């Protein structure tokens, strides 16, 4: 395997070629840093968290593909993944996971002790998540915790504590993550039913759209509460109204439960997250 091919394999294994997951992980993390700092976060902390998000998203993808390597070959969307297709060995993939995990932990060691403790919990959650798809119909709810764990870490890094507003933001991101990852699971629902993978898309059944809507409403409420507890104003409120618009559009996309529109609805959440972050940051400027 030449260097170019190896880079291609590694980038697909870590999803560097598909940054949507990294972005969905990044927006709430940046929101947490801005809220914790009351505006512009400490530059060192900001850089560490941006790099950390990229690395930990890569780690999560590796361990997910390792756990699903015998199943991914049976799913149309995932059968070409490097571990499923045999382009990379499990040993090499796990070695890359360890290297990246140590790099992320090295970054955390530049921060305070509370962040270090929270990071240990975060890496454990990251390792556990892929295996929940075999034992529970609600892996998306566990993913919501994993995907939101950077929020208390961001507050701890910036302020040395995790106040109530952090947990409002945590709850908002948890509800939002379950909603958009259920849309994502709707894409694979037929394949997952055949091979025994569990998901909220299967659990919710014919009520999937309605329950996703309830989670979107709950996310909105918690985003409002997080902003209220931090004394945010009109600009952030406009961002929340835009979030409602995105959520409505996503409901229209998933109405027919077809694969392509459901995936488009999932991708649309990146723009929702971007608008929330930008509106929050702008709220501190105006």
Swiss-Prot record:
Bilayer-crossing regions: 20-40, 43-63, 96-116, 142-162, 167-187, 210-230, 235-255, 266-286
Annotated pathway: Cofactor biosynthesis; ubiquinone biosynthesis
Example of a GO biological process term: ubiquinone biosynthetic process
CDD domains (alphabetical): PT_UbiA_COQ2
Cofactor(s) required for function per UniProt: Mg(2+)
The UniProt record lists the keyword Lipid metabolism: no
EC category name: transferase
InterPro entries: HB_polyprenyltransferase-like (IPR006370), Prenyltransferase (IPR039653), UbiA_prenyltransferase (IPR000537), UbiA_prenylTrfase_CS (IPR030470), UbiA_sf (IPR044878)
Pfam families: UbiA
Broad class of where this protein is predominantly found: membrane
Catalyzed reactions: all-trans-octaprenyl diphosphate + 4-hydroxybenzoate = 4-hydroxy-3-(all-trans-octaprenyl)benzoate + diphosphate
Function: Catalyzes the prenylation of para-hydroxybenzoate (PHB) with an all-trans polyprenyl group. Mediates the second step in the final reaction sequence of ubiquinone-8 (UQ-8) biosynthesis, which is the condensation of the polyisoprenoid side chain with PHB, generating the first membrane-bound Q intermediate 3-octaprenyl-4-hydroxybenzoate.
Protein name: 4-hydroxybenzoate octaprenyltransferase
Species in which this protein is naturally found: Shewanella oneidensis (strain ATCC 700550 / JCM 31522 / CIP 106686 / LMG 19005 / NCIMB 14063 / MR-1)
Lineage: Bacteria, Pseudomonadati, Pseudomonadota, Gammaproteobacteria, Alteromonadales
């Amino acid at each position: 395997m030449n260097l170019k091919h190896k880079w291609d394999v590694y980038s697909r294994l870590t999803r560097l070629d598909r940054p949507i997951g990294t972005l969905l992980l990044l927006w709430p993390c940046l929101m947490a840093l801005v809220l914790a700092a009351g505006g512009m976060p400490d530059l060192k902390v900001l850089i560490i968290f941006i790099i950390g998000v990229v690395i930990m998203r890569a780690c999560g993808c590796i361990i997910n593909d390792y756990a699903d390597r015998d199943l991914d070959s049976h799913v149309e969307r995932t059968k070409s993944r490097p571990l499923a297709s045999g382009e990379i060995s499990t040993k090499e993939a796990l070695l890359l996971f360890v290297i990246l995990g140590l790099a992320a932990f090295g970054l955390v060691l530049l921060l305070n002790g509370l962040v270090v403790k929270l990071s240990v919990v975060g890496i454990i959650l990251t390792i556990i998540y892929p295996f929940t798809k075999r034992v529970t119909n609600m892996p998306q709810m566990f993913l919501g915790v994993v995907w939101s764990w950077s929020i208390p870490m961001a507050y701890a890094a910036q302020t040395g504590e995790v106040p109530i507003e952090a947990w409002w933001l945590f709850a908002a991101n948890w509800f939002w993550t379950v909603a958009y990852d259920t849309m994502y699971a709707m894409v694979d629902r037929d394949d997952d039913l055949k091979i025994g993978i569990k998901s909220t898309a299967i659990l919710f059944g014919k009520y999937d759209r309605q329950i996703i809507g309830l989670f979107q409403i709950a996310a909105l409420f918690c985003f409002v509460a997080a902003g209220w507890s931090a004394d945010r104003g009109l600009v952030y409120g406009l961002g929340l109204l835009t979030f409602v618009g995105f959520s409505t559009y996503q409901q229209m996309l998933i109405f027919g439960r077809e694969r392509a529109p459901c995936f488009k609805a999932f991708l649309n959440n990146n723009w929702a997250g971007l608008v929330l972050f930008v509106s929050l940051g702008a709220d501190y400027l105006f």
